[in-house]
């Protein structure tokens, strides 16, 4: 693939990849990126049929609209975010570790053939459901800004970061995710949340739900909480405050010792 001209833009229609290419970065940052000296590609298509050994493919913010990675059995990382995609097939990529496909128009995604997946970011799509039962190694899941009414995380024991905000979830079961550190469930329809098993949680956001009480006394690693927009009365907020893990001593040199309540 030829290098972009000095203005950091590469305007073309379809790119054909040939030969022994292990990693390919064609990420773009649009007009704003161009102003900052970053890439502004305008690739509308990519042909990968003449190479089969890709490990890493980054097509971020190129208007390709369709993408065929079925001939890439060794693909480890794929970023097809903001590519105007309505569908994508990754069932032929069994080694996939990182899958980023956010900011598209996906209504479904099949991850049943990706058992090695560690990171899944499909935020800002049109998903109404997602099945993660065949991805037991997942450490990070981001499904924010979709239309999910339910999500099953029970088969993800290694999950450390769950970003589920701005969906239509009425319940979230985190009792099988003891490694969670970062939990974001704001902007849903939750009335309760149980984090008694999640003793490693450090950051918690459950704003804009209908949660009127929550006992976090066992979550002693917490240092940041966003609980706004739940309709708590002054008394309920006061009761909630006194369930928070208290710091016996705050050391100025360690700001993380402070508990921030938003």
Task: Give a label for each model feature.
Residues 24, 36, 55-59, 76-80, ...:
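Conserved hydrophobic beta-strand positions in leucine-rich repeat
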Residues 46, 67, 88, 109-111, ...:
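Canonical leucine-rich repeat
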Residues 177, 182-191, 195-212, 216-219:
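Eukaryotic tandem repeat interaction scaffolds
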């Amino acid at each position: 693939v030829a290098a972009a001209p000095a203005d950091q833009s590469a305007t073309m229609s379809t790119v054909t990849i040939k030969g022994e290419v292990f990693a390919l970065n064609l990420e773009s940052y649009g007009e704003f990126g161009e102003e900052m000296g970053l890439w502004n590609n305008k690739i509308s298509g990519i042909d990968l049929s003449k190479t089969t050994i890709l490990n890493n493919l980054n097509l971020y913010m190129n208007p390709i609209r369709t993408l065929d990675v079925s001939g890439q059995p060794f693909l480890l990382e794929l970023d097809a975010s903001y590519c105007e995609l309505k569908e994508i097939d990754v069932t032929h990529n069994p080694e996939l570790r990182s899958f980023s496909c956010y900011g598209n128009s996906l209504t479904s995604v099949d991850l049943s053939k990706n058992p090695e997946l560690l990171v899944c970011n499909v935020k800002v799509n049109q998903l109404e459901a997602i099945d993660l039962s065949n991805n037991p190694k997942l450490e990070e899941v981001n499904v924010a800004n979709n239309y999910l009414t339910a999500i099953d995380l029970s088969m993800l024991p290694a999950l450390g970061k769950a970003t589920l905000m701005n969906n239509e979830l009425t319940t979230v079961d985190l009792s099988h995710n003891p490694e969670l550190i970062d939990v974001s469930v704001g902007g849903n329809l939750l009335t309760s949340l149980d984090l008694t098993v999640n003793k490693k949680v450090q950051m918690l956001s459950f704003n804009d739900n209908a949660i009127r009480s929550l006992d976090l006394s066992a979550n002693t690693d917490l240092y940041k909480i966003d609980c706004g927009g739940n309709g708590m009365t002054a008394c309920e907020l006061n009761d909630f405050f006194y369930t928070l893990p208290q710091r016996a001593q705050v050391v100025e040199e360690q700001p993380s010792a402070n508990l921030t309540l938003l």
